[in-house]
Amino acid sequence: MRILLVNYRYFISGGPEKYMFNIKKMLEDNGHEVIPFSIHSNKNVETEYSKYFVEPIGSRDATYFEECKKTPKVIWQMLTRSIYSTEVEKAIKKEIKDVKPDLVYIIHFVNKLSPSVICGAKKMGVPVVLRLSDYFLLCPRFDFMYNKKPCEECLTKGYRTCIKKRCVKGSLFASVVRVFSMKVHKAMNIYKDVDAFITPSEFLKKKLIENGFDENKITCIPTFTASKSEVGKPQVGTYGLYFGRVTEEKGVDTVVKAYEMMPDRHVKIMGDDTTDEAKRLKAYIKEKNIKNVEFLGFKAGEELEEIIKGARFTLIPSIWYDNLPNTALESFQYSKPVIASNIGSLPELVLNGVNGYLFKPADAQELCEKVALLDDDAVVKKMGAASRAKLEDRFAPQTHYDTLMRIFESVRRK
């Protein structure tokens, strides 16, 4: 099968891109041809198909809109990429005409490529499968968050709530643009052209169905990770570990506050420590003279693996509807118990008392109580083994591949 893989970045910057390159390799290992469509960036992995890529908003050095100079051209690009880009439609139709894919598999496109990738593919008669990594179809700011708490007012009171509260980046302009684009897409009925939706979690699938999406078009296929037997043996480490984005919705401040109350225990926080939230938390730690919370910064490769191996357990303290984070699967891979917030998809990953513990989001005191439950080495080993078993049972690469191929074959036959 020849598959056109669409994502607005062709380099690893987060979970969706890790998935993109992992699924690309898996499909190719199984004899399929995978062809990318993306946006030019100086960070991109090299590919002969970059000649079909479109120019970014701003410069090829910028990853985020905030890094771009706000020239009239950049603002116009931002508007068209948010609403509908004829430039992108023309580019993807050109690539489809030349490479003749059997289907298009879309990972991320919002605000960078626009849903013209969907329309362009359908105009060329090619079926479209869309994987959802967040809540962009339902929430203007993608994460159902307002004022550090889950918020679904746009679903119950309408999208004017977003404009009133300036939910998108705290900006009236950005909020108006995002709401307007969602209304345009709804009026155009763009998502009717999607032949199948893939969700990583049952939680996201349920949200879509509750809000009018066709249940028959939605399949939950959890993210996968490779099962490495040489790193899967349970080891009892000496510290708690948070690894991932250090941003407000990830709830890292709950970890800091909990360990402030547990000065005899040690926690490491691994992730980009230059974010606004990381700077705020590091300043708090310095002000309060907290000695047992260690920021490691971003780590990768063998260094990342060794830090996870050395952990006693890992922490996922999210305060948003986290949508099957890769960090959970990586924890399972290394046979680590996970202490996670009882929110979003996390209860699908952590069975309380079996492979970890759940606690009330943002409740530092309850987090302390759950950490204390893992003082017993035997419990840590048992729960770590349960994490590994869950990985191999539900998140194995072959399971993901088999389910995905059933979807691909079904949309081809339509």
Model features per residue range: what roles?
Residues 366, 379-394, 400-406:
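A short, well-ordered alpha-helix in the C-terminal region of glycosyltransferases
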Residues 1-49, 124-127, 260:
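N-terminal subdomain of nucleotide-sugar transferases
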Residues 137, 156-230:
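Donor nucleotide-sugar binding/catalytic pocket of nucleotide-sugar-dependent glycosyltransferases
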Residues 279-302:
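Nucleotide-activated donor-binding/catalytic signature segment of Leloir-type glycosyltransferases, i.e.
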Residues 18, 245-261:
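A conserved mid-protein helix/loop that constitutes part of the nucleotide-sugar donor-binding site
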Residues 29-99, 103:
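A conserved catalytic-core segment of Leloir-type glycosyltransferases
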Residues 309-323, 336:
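Acidic donor-binding loop of glycosyltransferase active sites
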Residues 352-353, 357-364, 371-378:
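Conserved acidic donor-binding segment of nucleotide-sugar-dependent glycosyltransferases
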